[in-house]
């Protein structure tokens, strides 16, 4: 069994789930899986993946796990009580081999947002681990050697250059993930600030990290009063739920231009910072700092979180570029948890509908956008004043 606990996921799934429970418990959503890596035959392992999903759906949180969640300052008692009764239901998930693209799988999730939000991360971890254990021989000593080199590189930097683990969804295996975290903790000391993985945070006494993901802002394209106001509605909803806690806003759901137009003086003061997850990180940082300064907010009081495809070299370059001008945080994923030699898979599960309406992410990186409805993508770009889509 690959997933042993419902805590083996990213913290932001729980923080979003709590907001959904309190504000949108009746919302219905659709998610869809996509493998961006060409030539990957996942269909041959569909039965194995399906058995792992069955095992996942039998899991419930243990009393000590619920108590751990209760101990987090932002988890409210009613949500912890709800989680004590919660389990993932297989009826909301469909897994078949693609009839039109040999070797590909069709994985969709459809049901109440509240009851499906926890599927994404463990499903991606399952697919990854099934793939790698059937197609590669792990070289853990090579992985340890590479990890030691990364630790040494970071140790050569000033103490303020710190990283966190964001690598659950694309890890090589649960066992390797569990091995590398104490190595990072012991090797980096205060330069390792925590992990997005709640299970391992509990196990190793690390700080669990995370706020919101793209799906939260995407959903408000259907839940909000007007499409043009969807980002504002999502951020205000978050502020109502957490009252200043968990104050990192995600900036690339409809692109940075549209985000900065919505992120006015009120949000600049209210939120602790912003997270970068697509596009050029140096350009993004410069624009965010300029935006804060234009609103008379000192960037040195705000956090810029970088989490898009980071490796240690990029972390060090970003730190050297920005560290005197703002506070910094770095979430490193695949480069930590899946650097054993085999090529990592580029796999995602994205929300594509909410309450029957299409929703979309207009990423700042080509190829990261995902939507089933081209007409809606054109409309979304028009509403937010973005350039028209290139015709193909």
Swiss-Prot record:
Residues with Phosphohistidine modification = 214
- Give the taxonomic lineage as stored in the record: Bacteria, Pseudomonadati, Pseudomonadota, Gammaproteobacteria, Lysobacterales
- What biological-process terms (Gene Ontology) are attached? NAD biosynthetic process via the salvage pathway
Q: Kindly give the InterPro entries that the UniProt entry links to this protein.
A: N/Namide_PRibTrfase, NAPRTase_N, Nic_PRibTrfase, Nic_PRibTrfase-Fam, Nicotinate_pribotase-like_C
Q: What is its EC number?
A: 6.3.4.21
The record's annotation in Pfam families points to: NAPRTase, NAPRTase_N
Q: How is it modified after translation?
A: Transiently phosphorylated on a His residue during the reaction cycle. Phosphorylation strongly increases the affinity for substrates and increases the rate of nicotinate D-ribonucleotide production. Dephosphorylation regenerates the low-affinity form of the enzyme, leading to product release.
This protein's pathway reads: Cofactor biosynthesis; NAD(+) biosynthesis; nicotinate D-ribonucleotide from nicotinate: step 1/1
Q: Which SUPFAM superfamilies match?
A: Nicotinate/Quinolinate PRTase C-terminal domain-like, Nicotinate/Quinolinate PRTase N-terminal domain-like
Q: Which GO terms describe its molecular function?
A: nicotinate phosphoribosyltransferase activity
Q: Which CDD domains does UniProt cross-reference here?
A: PncB_like
Any one cellular-component term (Gene Ontology): cytosol
Homology family:
Belongs to the NAPRTase family.
Q: Which reactions is this enzyme annotated as catalysing?
A: nicotinate + 5-phospho-alpha-D-ribose 1-diphosphate + ATP + H2O = nicotinate beta-D-ribonucleotide + ADP + phosphate + diphosphate
Function recorded in the entry: Catalyzes the synthesis of beta-nicotinate D-ribonucleotide from nicotinate and 5-phospho-D-ribose 1-phosphate at the expense of ATP.
Checking NCBIfam families in the record gives: NAPRTase, PRK05321.1
Q: Coiled-coil ranges per the record? A: none
Query: By what name is this protein known?
Result: Nicotinate phosphoribosyltransferase
Q: State the source organism's domain of life.
A: Bacteria
